[in-house]
From Swiss-Prot:
It comes from Shewanella denitrificans (strain OS217 / ATCC BAA-1090 / DSM 15013). The keyword Transferase does not apply. The keyword Heme does not apply. PROSITE patterns: RIBOSOMAL_L19 (PS01015). It holds the Pfam family Ribosomal_L19. Belongs to the bacterial ribosomal protein bL19 family. One of its GO terms (cellular component) is cytosolic large ribosomal subunit. This is Large ribosomal subunit protein bL19. This protein is located at the 30S-50S ribosomal subunit interface and may play a role in the structure and function of the aminoacyl-tRNA binding site.
Amino acid sequence: MNNIIKMLNDEQMKTDVPDFGAGDTVVVQVRVKEGEKERLQAFEGLVIAKRNRGLHSAFTVRKISNGEGVERAFQTHSPLIASIEVKRRGRVRRAKLYYLRERSGKSARIREKLGTK
């Protein structure tokens, strides 16, 4: 039984997901269906949390829109996600950046990770 579930999960997992983590700035292209038409909507922001659970992996992206903080949670392997592009790597010392919710301006900045390790 477990082998069947594992096989189905592996079949549905995407292979083109880039390597990213908390602190990275990403652009997520989401498929949006409006009536009969379908279009791509870009959501660019900072990854504040990532949850790695195989097919059930998810991540949360936060951006500031018109002075208001907007967070959106995405399922990593969802068919509604067209692509994920990493714009900038951030250097952080925490796995979850929920403390950024209370901060604004210069105190909410994330240092950029330079070079590759």
